[in-house]
Amino acid sequence: MKKVLSNGTEYIYKNGELPEAIRLGDLKAALIRGNHKSALLKQETIEKAFIVEVNHGYQLPLLPRHALLLPDARASPLGVASQFSINDTGGIIEKDRVIHDLSHEGEVSKESINSMIDDDSLSHCPLVYGHMHSRCVHYIVATRYLYPQARILGSKADYKSAYRRQHLSSKASFHSMTQATLVQSMFILLALRLTFGGKVCPFDWCTISEPVVDLANALLDCDSWDPSSIHSPSQHLVPATKYLPDSIPLAAARELLVDVPVSEFGRVDGYIDDLPTFGPDLSPLHRSKLAAASFLAIHITGRDVSSLDLFPRQSLLASNKLAAEGGLCEALIVLGWLYNTRALTVSLPSHKHIAWKNSITDAIDSKSMLPSELETLIGRLNHMASIMTMSRHFLSRLRYYFDKSKEPNKKYSRIFFNKSVIHDLNLWLLFLDKAYNGISMNILVFRKPTHIYRTDACEYGLGGSFSDGTLWRWAIPHDLLHRAHISLLEFMGMLIPIWMDVLNGSLSLHDCILSLGDSSNAVGWMVKSNFKSAEENLPDQLAKLEVSRTLASLILSEDLILWSQWMCGDDNIIPDICSRDWHLLDNDLINNLTSLFSNSNQQRIPHFKMRPVPKEIDLFLCSVLQKLPKNPLRFKTPKTSGFDPGVDGKNSFSPSACKAMFSWKHLLSHKEMQSVSPSAKPSAKETLKANSKESNVEPYGIPSDMYRRPLSLV
């Protein structure tokens, strides 16, 4: 921190500076090109913003003729991004943010400031704010679980012009030049403070802001701190605590899989310039600490405003937002989501629900969108998918159309959608309504699984087991053989037991599913289906999308949590037997399994029983396979599991295999698999082994910064 504050933010390039001729070529081209279209369309916004910036000493204005005289100068364009903010009373207002696009490539070098940055130079402060939303939700659920009868209160503190509080080094300023029209004259502007668009800026700002969060948490835990006597000068602006009606019951929290430390005085977290605070309402002292800690921490670290300053300065704390967001309450907007700590829900605010729904409805009516509109829509839906992860399965077609619109030599004035995309957009309308009505925090956290499914597949059949010893298997009809590649069959197999339990009524609201399989591709597709494996062709991809959409619809409609995990094939014995041993009738297969367990000297022998695959699922599987052409390259000679004493097979299970079959904890701590996450990506077994060094092993393979804030980051 001392280096950053003393020397300013520096741009360190991995391959050094550009050659002088190339730099000058980039600079001249940038000055001729000017700013992005979004900035040109909002000249008044640019002028208003930069007059304020110049008056506060954040930008240094120069005449255009000075641009080529500055040593090492480089220029990047401005843009304007529209977003929502709140006014002093908490009302939603549209706000334009000026963006300094340091990712824009130079005309000659084909390099941008951001692309040249040496990533190794950014390691001085880890960026943990990306998981702040997840940590807050985990903390709220853990607090309710520990204090089931207590209200949970929250508030939010904001920095005023956060990035403008840290200065750039002189060289970085020369490399952060832009241009704008101010008072009817063109000026060259040197950025003297952190820019909105610089790759380095979040790292250097977090070097300053993360210790402030640490300080706020230290204040909460400090027994000698009396917030009534030591507090921010703006504390009197914080409104009184607001409670939701008692008619709304306190929602119960489900038990977590991970250990989240809960302090009786609450916790503060941080996302760049936002500092949300949450804690239990246990006494007046608890409330007063919760209401003051983050504001005092920001005040302590900021220099007092003085009339002697050469440039007008504002308080580090955004006092204008205190009335709207500073007071303790049970309903608070954090990162664009409405947290209801009483009902334990996260929901899409009404203004976003209306705007986003209108955008989708217009696209459905016209069956088309402008490329810029589609890009905005994808960003919005991806934001929504942060709490409805399974909805990402329905983004792939939209992304495909947007990527097509960017192909070289193709300029699309409008993008026209086919029936499949229109179907996806109609589903997104349902998802938007669901998000607006609220998603339970209990399905947004890492929880102990309530249902465990193990599955396997071969070229001739699918099979698996439930945790109570129930078995299932499905033989691929003869005329549908040799169509699907094995990864797709494995994926279909992982869908079946979930669907069976939904139809059977065995899954309850907010249940947590752990789906286990020995295909890394299929395990990854359970949560992310827009990537393509080497053996896939177009019909394969369409079939995979059909399966993934069916899976996502089940999970979303039933409000379930789905985790998927790879397991070693040697431990996946029962599903392997169910999928391969078609020479055995159901009763013979069950007797064989019972005999194998008996011969393994197991104290607990499962009560095996076979459950038939429902007709609805059978018809779906057949319809998927019927759409695939036969492929001679996918012909495989039938092969049994080898666990059949009647044909000189193995007559018992190994102890480790028996343990793996019925112990999910054994699987979660398995050294070959350190990923239990909704965003898990498929990878080869060798990669999994390479990434399982003891020094990197965390509980159940879940990154700890997803559920608890690291201490003393800087």
Which residue stretches match the model-derived regions?
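RNase H catalytic domain
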Residues: 268-272, 279, 499-573, 577-582
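A conserved non-catalytic segment of reverse transcriptases
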Residues: 89, 178, 186-192, 269, ...
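C-terminal functional segments of enzyme domains
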Residues: 333, 338-344, 558-617
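Catalytic-core region of right-hand nucleic acid polymerases
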Residues: 41, 45-50, 54-220, 347-397, ...
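Catalytic palm subdomain of template-directed nucleic-acid polymerases
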Residues: 107-119, 165-168, 233-307, 341-346, ...
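Amphipathic alpha-helical
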Residues: 40, 50-56, 402-442
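Metal-dependent nuclease catalytic cores in nucleic-acid-processing enzymes
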Residues: 135-145, 210-214, 488-510, 546-557
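A short, polar/acidic, helix/strand-boundary loop motif
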Residues: 185-210, 246-250, 362, 467-492, ...
